[in-house]
Amino acid sequence: MKVILIKDTKDGKANTIIDVSPGYATNFLFKNKLAEPLNSRTEKLLVKRKQQIEIEKQEKQEQIAKLKIEIEKLVLWFKLKGNKESVHGAITAKKIKKELEIKGIFVDKQAIQTSGISTFGTSFVDIKLSSQTIAKLKINITKDE
């Protein structure tokens, strides 16, 4: 019996057509609302769902690309105390996230890939926006008088 999976299961991912035994389909998949039987109506719905998912995926990629451009144009300025050789403190992912939020850019703290910047001058921090997209944020650290 052919069914369309509604949710991810051990048999496959959501929105895929699989072939299972009638008993398994009736007693487990349909009962737990994990699948629906394949017919002309559900097949049309599947095509529409896949198109909608593809559109949403493209829109998300466009948003990520715009966000990457916006982040790479940005320069964050921080002041740290210290003398010529040593710096007291560090710029952490938490501080970077806070500054980005002030500028209107919201990213997850775990996306900011830094272990803390503790040197004066210019540094670059990677911000992982997706599995394939990484933006480089420019950070300038000056001496606080």
UniProtKB/Swiss-Prot annotation:
Give the UniProt keywords, A-Z.
Ribonucleoprotein, Ribosomal protein, RNA-binding, rRNA-binding
Which Gene Ontology terms describe the biological processes this protein takes part in? translation
GO MF, any single term = rRNA binding
Top-level division of the source organism's lineage: Bacteria
Stored InterPro entries: Ribosomal_bL9 (IPR000244), Ribosomal_bL9/RNase_H1_N (IPR009027), Ribosomal_bL9_bac/chp (IPR020594), Ribosomal_bL9_C (IPR020069), Ribosomal_bL9_C_sf (IPR036791), Ribosomal_bL9_N (IPR020070), Ribosomal_bL9_N_sf (IPR036935)
* Cellular compartments per GO CC: ribonucleoprotein complex; ribosome
Q: Which PROSITE patterns match?
A: RIBOSOMAL_L9
Q: Which NCBIfam families match?
A: L9
Family of the protein in this entry = Belongs to the bacterial ribosomal protein bL9 family.
Q: What does this protein do?
A: Binds to the 23S rRNA.
Q: List the protein's name.
A: Large ribosomal subunit protein bL9
Q: Can you name the source organism? A: Mesomycoplasma hyopneumoniae (strain 7448) (Mycoplasma hyopneumoniae)
